[in-house]
Amino acid sequence: MYLTREEERILAGEEGEARAKALEVIVKVGEAVGAERLIPIKHAHVSGASYMTIGDAGLRFLARLAESGARFSVPTTVNPVSYDVEEPGAIPMTRLSPRIVKAQSEILKALEAMGADLILTCTPYYTEVPRRVGLREGDSVAWGESSAVAYANSVLGIHTNREGGPLALMAGIAGRTYFYGAHDPEWRKPRVAYRLETPKVLDETEAGVLGEVIATQHRDEHPPLLDAPLGGEAALKEFSAAVGSAGSLAMVHITGVTPGDPGDMIEEVVTMDYGDLARRMEDLAPGFEPDILYVGCPHASIEELRRLYRALSKAGERAGRRTVVSISRSLYLQALREGLVEKLKGLGVRFVRDSCLIVSPFSSGARGVRVATNSYKAYFYLSKKGVEVGLAPIEALPKLVS
């Protein structure tokens, strides 16, 4: 692999052993996939920060890194953790042991020592981070959160491979990643197109199910091209989360949304019918009265909070008291300033910052609990943990509670 003089200096340990080791990892992975050079990144986002996800082994790894003097060389942010840092008991039906609290606290301490910005969200694109870092279309980053990776490539035109948590961590320390995959303009040109014949604009749950279909069908190494009407930011967010959870796609070129020229390399066109999508929606619809109405996977946007308030205002108190919203601390503060938090709490809604039902102890101890959500990703992961999950858009959720 070709290295610049600066990269050779880093690898030789002139900027510390920790940064040299991090760059060595990036180089070895790059060589394994055939990358010919490295590129600088402007930002890293580390996934796998929850103790429920990485356990004691992950804690020891991060603690050793911090003790070795490892420091992030580019702005680096962090995914959600096991609980709301300021209100640990915020997640309902969840037993949070002192051991989990202590271990999670040590993980955060190690990441903070390395210079991480503890925004603790899976939606860094909703925070002030892109503006603060100066991220623009075409910039390269190293993100580890699958839903954010798909959103960055497909909606924002920011370039990132789907990095594992440790690799995003190493990229943040090294300040480099390998030139391959989503960083290569040629790779970003689709060869297979999917066209959905539909009489309507898709809401976020339909978009999520469409994401499942695309992710499980697509086999080409290049990203697919999608021609389908996705209705607004929630639909784009849930679609991105679905293609990242049901499969391993890092990007879908969405007609009319994704920046940049998709090129003219299409070799195959797959036509899909809305009826097939509707039948899958029926399979996933709640056939029960839920114990929890859940919004915010990935973390909720301000627009979703507004929609939720309008929907709950028309429903009874019972629906509000069963509603849980997970959200980034950054957007929670914005919603607080707009009066949305007070309005929703007045209806009984519970907020969970810094965390979510998936990466908290809830997902391992909620067997038998019934959850209705607008998120395909929440359905995908919670149903694997023995939770009964049904899918419905925000406007339909309160109507499920009698």
Swiss-Prot record:
Neither the addition of 1 mM Mg(2+) nor 1 mM Mn(2+) has a significant effect on the activity, whereas Zn(2+) causes almost complete inactivation. Strongly inhibited by H(2)O(2), but not by EDTA or iodoacetamide. Optimum pH is 7.0. One of its GO terms (molecular function) is metal ion binding. Coiled coil: none annotated. Pfam families: AcnX (PF04412). InterPro entries: PMDh-L-like_dom. Binds 1 [4Fe-4S] cluster per subunit. Pathway: Isoprenoid biosynthesis; isopentenyl diphosphate biosynthesis via mevalonate pathway. GO terms for biological process: isoprenoid biosynthetic process. [4Fe-4S] cluster binds at residues 122, 297, 356. Heterodimer composed of a large subunit (PMDh-L) and a small subunit (PMDh-S). Component of a hydro-lyase that catalyzes the dehydration of mevalonate 5-phosphate (MVA5P) to form trans-anhydromevalonate 5-phosphate (tAHMP). Involved in the archaeal mevalonate (MVA) pathway, which provides fundamental precursors for isoprenoid biosynthesis, such as isopentenyl diphosphate (IPP) and dimethylallyl diphosphate (DMAPP). This is Phosphomevalonate dehydratase large subunit. It comes from Aeropyrum pernix (strain ATCC 700893 / DSM 11879 / JCM 9820 / NBRC 100138 / K1).
